[in-house]
């Protein structure tokens, strides 16, 4: 009975494991991650609104749950995009996937999901793996890259988003997806207000760039709906294990497309993070 929710999560993981590349192409064309996110999610919203109109879906604009989910998910998406544009893709993914550690604690307090001893052991293993990745001879913990901090904070936001998605059963899947799309647009606009120098030149708006943006928008439209469906059906901590497929996709795509590789200690720390996630999700 969980085949469709599992497929939904794996599809979402695949999309987010490969989507860094078109975002980088847009960045190379002179469009920052903030502006590309704004354009892409406006397109995504444009694709979605006819569906809401035709099906007469209610938009809960007066719901505080809707807007809280919107803001958290919006920050999660923006920070993730900025991290994968500026940082090493696999390193960013591994730091992002400390999210199950945060999910363990959030799901316990917000969802009253059963937290067992193995969950705390899993959290310890994952955090230890992160320390291995960050360790430097002259520093105990060394995060000097903006992309590292963005990846970590995005992972926390992702955990919060998934927990809220499962908690807010009174909201439909399409309403949750709409909250995410609107949230990205809101956060992007707020960022633009404080960073007015990132406006792309009009040379960007070529057919090939428009095609890239539309392709991303379509992928995000379907992946958001499917992930919301999957997370609604499967426990938050268990769902985290299926998102690990994203790391596999990212590792292969970053090597083949841009020749990225990471250090041995980062692989070792990453293996510990993955082991912790699998232990936490073990049913």
Where are these regions (language model features)?
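Hydrophobic/aromatic residues within transmembrane alpha-helices
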Residues: 26, 36, 83, 95, ...
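Juxtamembrane C-cap of transmembrane helices in multi-pass membrane transport proteins
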Residues: 14-30, 78-87, 95, 109, ...
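Glycine-/small-residue-enriched transmembrane alpha-helix faces in small-molecule transporters
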Residues: 1-35, 79, 123-124, 131, ...
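Membrane-interface helix-cap regions at the ends of transmembrane helices
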Residues: 44-62, 128-142, 184-209, 255-256, ...
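Helix-helix packing/entry segments at the starts of transmembrane helices
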Residues: 7, 39, 93-98, 168-183, ...
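Loop-to-transmembrane-helix transition segments
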Residues: 4-12, 56-79, 123, 146-154, ...
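Hydrophobic alpha-helical transmembrane segments of multi-pass integral membrane proteins
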Residues: 4-8, 33-50, 125, 149, ...
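Loop-to-transmembrane alpha-helix entry segments
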Residues: 60, 93-96, 112-132, 141-148, ...
């Amino acid at each position: 009975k969980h085949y469709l929710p599992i497929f939904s999560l794996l599809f979402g993981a695949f999309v987010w494991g490969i989507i860094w590349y078109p975002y980088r192409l847009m960045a190379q064309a002179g469009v920052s991650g903030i502006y590309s996110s704004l354009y892409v999610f406006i397109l995504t919203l444009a694709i979605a609104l006819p569906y809401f109109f035709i099906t007469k879906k209610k938009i809960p604009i007066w719901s505080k749950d809707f807007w809280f989910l919107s803001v958290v998910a919006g920050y999660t998406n923006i920070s993730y995009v900025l991290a994968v544009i500026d940082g090493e893709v696999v390193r960013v993914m591994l730091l992002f996937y400390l999210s199950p550690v945060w999910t363990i604690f959030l799901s316990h307090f917000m969802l009253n999901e059963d937290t067992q001893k193995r969950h705390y052991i899993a959290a310890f293993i994952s955090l230890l793996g992160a320390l291995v990745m960050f360790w430097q001879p002259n520093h105990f913990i060394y995060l000097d890259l903006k992309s590292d901090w963005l990846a970590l904070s995005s992972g926390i936001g992702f955990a919060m988003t998934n927990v809220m998605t499962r908690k807010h059963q009174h909201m439909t899947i399409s309403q949750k997806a709409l909250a995410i799309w609107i949230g990205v647009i809101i956060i992007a606009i707020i960022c633009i207000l404080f960073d007015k120098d990132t406006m792309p030149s009009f040379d960007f708006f070529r057919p090939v760039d428009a095609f890239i943006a539309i392709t991303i928008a379509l992928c995000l439209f379907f992946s958001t709906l499917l992930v919301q469906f999957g997370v609604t059906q499967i426990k938050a901590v268990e769902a985290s294990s299926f998102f690990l497929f994203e790391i596999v996709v990212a590792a292969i795509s970053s090597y083949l497309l841009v020749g990225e590789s990471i250090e041995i200690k980062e692989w070792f720390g990453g293996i510990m993070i993955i082991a912790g996630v699998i232990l936490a999700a073990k049913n």
